[in-house]
Amino acid sequence: GGSCAIKYAENESVKPKAVFAIDPPLDFERFYNSAKRDIRLSKDRQANEENIYIIDRLEKETGGNPSTHLAEYYKISPYSFSDTVQTEIKKLSTIPLRVYTEPDINWWLKERGADFTSINATECSAMINELNKLGNEDAVLIVTQNNSYRKPDNRRHPHSWSIVDNAELIKWLLKQP
């Protein structure tokens, strides 16, 4: 959802007043490569089905992998770490943007065997940093801690919508001109 919201703000002629995203994957080149790596490192060659789906879907959407179709990955990504021109994020230089993330690396290591290369926090912070350097002072990264619980059973999971303070987010949205 968050990746789509950011891409919408980048590409549509009717611009939203503000955009927010909750721990979105932003760099689909990184997403593809981390899924490939996770499969390679999987225990007993039992690959996570989500990683297999991600690779298949991205190859269908782009016509191949990042090595052969990098320009297509740049087009579908809200942010691309390796795109030194950063065509896509320049379109966000005047739009207030909030990106929420809870990079609980110890949880990821223990529960999923994942490291920073497999989570979205790195590219979320990189995108906000680059937008700030482009002059967008209204681009903000909100990093939470111990807020991530999935409903209805309150299971701990850092990639959860519960990291957002809903009342505070609504106040922020309503304040946008």
Predicted regions and their residues:
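C-terminal catalytic histidine-bearing segment of alpha/beta-hydrolase fold enzymes
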Residues: L97-E111, S118-P177
